[in-house]
Amino acid sequence: MSFFDSLRQKAPFLDKLADSFTPTLTRDEKFRLKYKLPANENILEDTNAEVSFATSIKDGKGHSDRVNNKGRKTAYVYSGRLFLTPHFLVFRDAFDHSSCVLILNISTIKRVERSPSESYEFALLVTLYTGAKVLIQFIGIRYRSEQFCDKLKLNLKENIPNAKTLPAFLETSYSEFLIAKNILGKKDITVPRAGLGQHFKYPGNPTMVKEKAKLRLWFDYFRENGRNLAVVQTPMFRKLIRIGVPNRMRGEIWELCSGAMYMRYANSGEYERILNENAGKTSQAIDEIEKDLKRSLPEYSAYQTEEGIQRLRNVLTAYSWKNPDVGYCQAMNIVVAGFLIFMSEEQAFWCLCNLCDIYVPGYYSKTMYGTLLDQRVFESFVEDRMPVLWEYILQHDIQLSVVSLPWFLSLFFTSMPLEYAVRIMDIFFMNGSITLFQVALAVLKINADDILQADDDGMFIAIIKHYFQTLGQSAHPDSSDIKYRQITKFQELLVTAFKEFSVISEEMAMHARHKYEKGIFQNIETFMKRTQLRHMPKTFNLSSDDLSNIYDMFYQSIETYKISMGTGSSNMGFEVFIQFLSKFCDSCRPCEKDKDPAFRKQKRNFLQRLFDNWDSAHIGELTLNDVVTGLDKLVTVDLLQAINYFFSLYDTDGDGELHREEVLQLSEGLLLLTEPWKSGRYVDLLTKKRIEDDIAENIIKESGGEIATMNQIELPTGVTIDEEKYKVEQAERYLKAASNFLQRSFEYAKAVDLAEEVNLIDLSDDEGEEKRTVKQKQLESIKANAALDPTHPKVIDLPTFRMIILADETYELFFSNTLRSSVHVDEHVNIDNKNKVLRSMFDGILADGKRVAEQVRRRVDSVATRSSIASVESTPTAAASSITTKEEKYDDLDDFTSEHQPENEELLQSSWFEIDDANETSTKAIQERSFEPLSANSSEEKSNLIEFEA
């Protein structure tokens, strides 16, 4: 026993140890998550390589490439790892995995050729649709490099149909519009369709100078580093996002960082298809959407017009049909309303998909388990990073989650002015969900002194609300330093969040989530259980403990449904129903006779009848309320109600009569339900009484009939029982009961007058189709009764059925006690527990010495009694529209054909945006090398081609 004691003592430690490990992801899962790739992408090949880039777009001085002092073209060379997936070519540098990141959709590749090299290096020159070139120099064993190239060649050929859709997709890209207008000089191009801000103004009051300066910075970046599906992400990319994304570019940058752009390209036309296929349909989610449409960012003018409301309705409706497990959830309307200001409907739809699946899984679910979990994680971060503030919050019983939960759930859209909330979203899509923790911690840190003066939740909320309303004001209004005085509270918030709390990493958040996940899920499940139990239908024969057990077994059986996550179907199908009943109903447990196909068919027929009877909505599935109502009827303590309910199972037309076929089916149902006792797997009260009587007789014989008091009764310690004898007797009794039932049913059946029952010559034309169908079934049933008497068919009604059952002692006991006792809704079910054999039943009888002794005393006193003995039959235990005026239109905002503006340089030099790690500016991974361009002749040599050109 010392071994088990040791295990018991170590169990709490082992539980804590298990909590310290986070769930491991596969290599492909980590890869997709890091680069926000679609779910069907996986690594096919990977290799070490050096990558350099050459743009085809000339700069303002007419040069397209860097030239060294010798006049030779040069390019930065990045050393790192190159990955190939079915639709992407991904490169990351070896230094910090962020100095150079290229996520290249292979549809953008127009040409691939082997590059000549003086040093005999194995290299490829990849030409993109923009004319830019990517030089890939492989490092490593040559055959591995050739294997990578062969796979790339195969993928390019297979991707030709997708590449044909690229031009249409690029027409929706604003970055493509910028380049076409300012570099290519196209005059007939139209601005891509964007968000509501294109017509209803963007949030805030940005000056034209700053907006154009930001747009110029992004224009320069796209010119040098590519755009949309073929952009190279460098530290400058992240810096430009922190500076602030131009309103016109925000939608594209959001979907690029989130990976929604890849999903939109891969699933072109799916958004429109979902809307068209489900047009006119209704659902609970759509009803909830309609209720919240008017409450979605009402301060923004577009959502006071039908155009804005319709766009929002379309996106939310489409998502509810795409993901029916989630449908529509609280605060989803707020987030999508924020997206639609900067995005088209299709962009917002795919961005919402990736938001729910990748960034904040579980936030927008029926139970909001992700939000609740992150609230607990946030509290742990506050406790760890700001212990004094945390102690004050606990002492004054301030509910931190009351304040912080809307921040996380609405992604700050409803907490701070929109012009600042979208800046948070810029960084959120770049860095992930840790942005929410960092900003939330910074809010508390900045307002800590004021919060320490708050006594309750109301004061706490007022402090935070006032802070958010004054984000545009100076953070240091009393400072003598002008530059210091110009720093706004929002700038201070960004620096605090992303410098002081930069230690909050994704790994820390994942570890904390895993640590608190189990407790949060248990709390959600407990809450859901209590809520559902309170709303269950009224029961007369099931206790609260019974309902609790039924709830547990019901959801335990539905493997696809996760209560804590609120996903999957909460209804039970027929196959699951069979497994459900087998957990606690003796007649439905697996047995030896299940090997017989005839018996198996008989069991399924009865269970299907029971299933259909319980299916109140006639949808082919059972809800929890259906199961509770059905079980309440099944375990009734009233004998007549039990008989009536069993009769109603077969009286499908509800006329109160059973014809011949229905009687035979009812008889088969009785045989099925009584099979455990007929086969001797269990004993009923009559058999137990017989066993006790025999034991008492033996004791009396051995004592010579001289027992006078209870104290004089000595129970035998080694009594043996002839099990086979009692099995046979019980089986014969049940077989005789079944035989008597059929005999008496035919004997006492009531004759049917055909003239009264069915008018064989029906001349009426005022009856409905349904009534005529019922009469036709009655006629067919009566004709089938010809085996009894062709001229005088018979039926049995409910009173006759009662009489037949009550006339047989075995069946009377079955409906009064045995059936009810065989349904173990009062016991916890464990699927792994095996049924106990009959031997254990007899052992239990012998162990109850007091009851046997009392029986002996009654025999001695010659008191004839038939009182029932309270015992368990079966022992197995289981467990307003504001259109932009002329002066508000910035017609030349995206026109950079004029001279370079100095404002964008001032933005780049601002120290408030130098938030990245120090190593970001390091150039250890970057080398400037000579870039040998291909001559016109060599580029056309077929011997150097990998035989792909689209």
UniProtKB/Swiss-Prot annotation:
Keyword Amino-acid biosynthesis: no
Domain EF-hand: from-to ranges: 602-637, 638-673
Localization annotation: Cytoplasm
A GO MF label: GTPase activator activity
Region described as Disordered: 878-950
Secreted recorded as keyword: no
N-acetylserine modification, residue list: 2
Main location: cytoplasm
Residue ranges of domain GRAM in the record: 29-116
Residue ranges occupied by any Rab-GAP TBC domain in the UniProt entry: 244-432
Gene3D superfamilies named in the record: EF-hand (1.10.238.10), putative rabgap domain of human tbc1 domain family member 14 like domains (1.10.8.270), Ypt/Rab-GAP domain of gyp1p, domain 3 (1.10.472.80)
Top-rank lineage group of the source organism: Eukaryota
InterPro entries: EF-hand-dom_pair, EF_hand_dom, GRAM, Rab-GAP-TBC_dom, Rab-GAP_TBC_sf, Rab_GAP_TBC_domain
Keywords linked to the UniProt accession: Acetylation, Cytoplasm, GTPase activation, Phosphoprotein, Repeat
GO annotations of cellular component type: cytoplasm; mating projection tip
Further remark: Present with 768 molecules/cell in log phase SD medium.
Subunit: Interacts with MAC1.
The protein's name: GTPase-activating protein GYP2
Gene source species: Saccharomyces cerevisiae (strain ATCC 204508 / S288c) (Baker's yeast)
